[in-house]
């Protein structure tokens, strides 16, 4: 039976580029074997780019962005899911080449869905979202590389952002001494400390200019959702055997550096991909996020709830670099 719902739609046609809230029907949804009644979505930098004409995310129009969603299965022909099941979705093609979460209903490939784990509701799942999932993958990577609380401070770059703030909360919960680095030190320092940061420093303080290829061993590990030249600069300060978990490029897609931190100190540079993360690994990380790694401090502060009518201004704030913490988008 055809159903109607609201969706935030991006259009580009003879009338130009525009975004807005529209009334859609299920006939307009893309193919998939599970239909989800969306309760919450989130906002990520990729979503903000998808809402712009030159963001290089969306390839065909009209389009519904939103790479994250959580809700209840309304209809399913997938063997793993039945109507009434609580699910979440992050990554894969959702919100990139397949209509995403800024919609009252979403029809998806059931292989992309994660059963909502015990310990999380839809709102908390989207407050965590891709950002928190990426943060957890990053923390897991440095743990697997051997990081332990006794090794000394862990640096979190871009700590006021979604990935960074979630990483601060998770690492603090695990007993690490967390140094939060941010370009918004003065405005967000107290908030970052409330998440568990032991100290908050400016981005330049994380890796002061050093003449040589190596600098004083300072960081036992680095959570880096920023990228750019700061990644190479920070590597000079990583302790012997430490690791950098790199997940983003808001600071740029390239850097210049030397091999010395990697071959003389055994520093590991670990790439973090949350989009196509295998399902078995994905399920394990979400289970931790609902339990022993649940970022309670981040979920209790710094989360702003909006509706579809507040989505365009929030996307613009993210594009302008003025957003702090996480947004959740309530649907229905």
What would you call each of these model-derived segments?
Residues 90-155:
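NAD(P)H dinucleotide-binding glycine-rich loop of Rossmann-like/cofactor-binding domains
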Residues 3, 283-332:
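C-terminal hydrophobic helical "lid"/dimerization subdomain
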Residues 206-217:
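Short amphipathic alpha-helix with an adjacent loop that forms part of the alpha/beta core around
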Residues 68, 85-86, 105, 153, ...:
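Residue-level marker of beta-strand positions
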Residues 229-295, 330-331:
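Glycine-rich phosphate-binding loop and adjacent beta-alpha segment
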Residues 88, 220-223, 245:
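N-terminal Rossmann-like NAD(P) cofactor-binding module of classical short-chain dehydrogenase/reductase
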Residues 126-204:
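Mid-domain Rossmann-like dinucleotide-binding core that forms the NAD(H)/NADP(H) cofactor-binding site
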Residues 27-43, 54-94:
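Glycine-rich beta-strand-centered segment in the early N-terminal region that forms part
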């Amino acid at each position: 039976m055809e159903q109607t719902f609201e969706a935030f739609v991006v259009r580009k046609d003879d009338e130009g580029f525009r975004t807005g809230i529209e009334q859609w029907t299920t006939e307009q949804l893309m193919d998939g074997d599970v239909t989800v009644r969306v309760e919450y979505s989130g906002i990520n930098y990729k979503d903000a780019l998808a809402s712009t004409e030159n963001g290089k995310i969306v390839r065909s129009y009209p389009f519904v962005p939103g790479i994250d969603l959580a809700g209840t299965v309304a209809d399913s022909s997938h063997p793993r899911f039945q109507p009434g099941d609580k699910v979440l979705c992050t990554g894969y093609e959702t919100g990139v080449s397949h209509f995403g979460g800024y919609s009252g209903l979403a029809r998806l490939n059931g292989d992309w869905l994660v059963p909502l784990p015990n310990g999380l509701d839809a709102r908390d799942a989207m407050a965590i979202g891709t950002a928190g999932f990426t943060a957890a993958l990053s923390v897991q990577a440095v743990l697997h590389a051997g990081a332990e609380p006794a090794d000394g401070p862990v640096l979190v770059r871009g700590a006021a952002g979604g990935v960074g703030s979630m990483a601060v909360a998770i690492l603090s919960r695990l007993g690490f001494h967390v140094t939060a680095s941010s370009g918004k030190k003065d405005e967000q320092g107290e908030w970052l400390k409330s998440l568990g940061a032991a100290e908050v420093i400016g981005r330049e303080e994380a890796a002061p200019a050093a003449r040589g290829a190596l600098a004083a061993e300072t960081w036992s590990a680095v959570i880096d959702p920023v990228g750019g030249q700061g990644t190479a600069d920070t590597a000079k300060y990583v302790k012997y055997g430490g690791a950098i978990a790199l997940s983003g490029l808001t600071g740029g897609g390239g850097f210049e550096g030397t091999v010395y931190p990697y071959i003389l100190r055994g520093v590991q540079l670990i790439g973090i991909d949350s989009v196509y993360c295998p399902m078995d690994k994905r399920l394990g990380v979400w289970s931790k996020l609902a339990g022993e790694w649940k970022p309670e401090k981040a979920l209790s502060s710094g989360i702003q709830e909006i509706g579809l009518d507040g989505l365009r201004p929030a996307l613009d704030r993210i594009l302008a670099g003025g957003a702090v913490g996480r947004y959740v988008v309530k649907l229905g």
